[in-house]
Amino acid sequence: NYCYFIMEFVQKGNIYSLISQDKTKRLSNHLIANLMKDVISAVYFLHKMNPPIIHRDIKPENVLLAEGNVAKLTDFGWSNYMQDDEKRTTVCGTPIYLAPEIIDETGHDEKVDVWCIGILLFELSTGNIPFLGNNIETLKSNIRNMNISWPRDINPEIKNLISKILKYDPKARISIPEILNHSFFTTYIDNPTQYLITPDEQTQYKPFVVSTDNPKDPPVIINKMVKE
């Protein structure tokens, strides 16, 4: 009569809580690099699925923190599949993270997630968002015109990387492997692109049934990790 879902417990809250704890205290570059590596590898995995999945709402509130500061991407409420070269047209996501092509309703693809990666990196590095506005129209205008509010003390390597990601033209944005190959990541992570795993390469999960000796206990289906 019942269906039980056994879900992972991620006990350290989300990245937003980490940033907002003390805005005067910056996160270390090492921590930023490793948190972003986890998010980027998750996005890469989604984009390599068949068909590809775009998340469309990557932001600090949607990145959970597990023990050891392992970042886990969550909340797929705005996600969707990509079919062939067809672009999506739904205006969705959180305004301060919207890519220009979503604002302009010209159609969008996986590159909207790359844009959000740049926004997230900016926020982790500075504690602020790159595009400001007292109202939604001013915000949209600043995004369209690429009016980025750069802090004077931002790490030069991070600024260089963000500048390569936050491009108005989606085709001009660097790819996910290029992001992880940037000097900012290679400085703090050994061979960061090794974490880019495709669905075909990942260890597979197979369901199996667990039961007890008590006939009154319902069987439980668990997704067990097995190597093909």
What are these regions (language model features)?
Residues 50-65:
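Catalytic-loop of the protein kinase fold
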Residues 16-26:
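AlphaC helix of the protein kinase catalytic domain
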Residues 35-36:
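Activation segment signature within eukaryotic-like protein kinase domains
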Residues 2-14:
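Conserved short submotifs of the Hanks-type protein kinase catalytic core
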Residues 126-129:
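Structural helix C-cap motif within protein kinase domains
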Residues 177, 181-228:
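C-terminal regulatory tails of eukaryotic serine/threonine kinases
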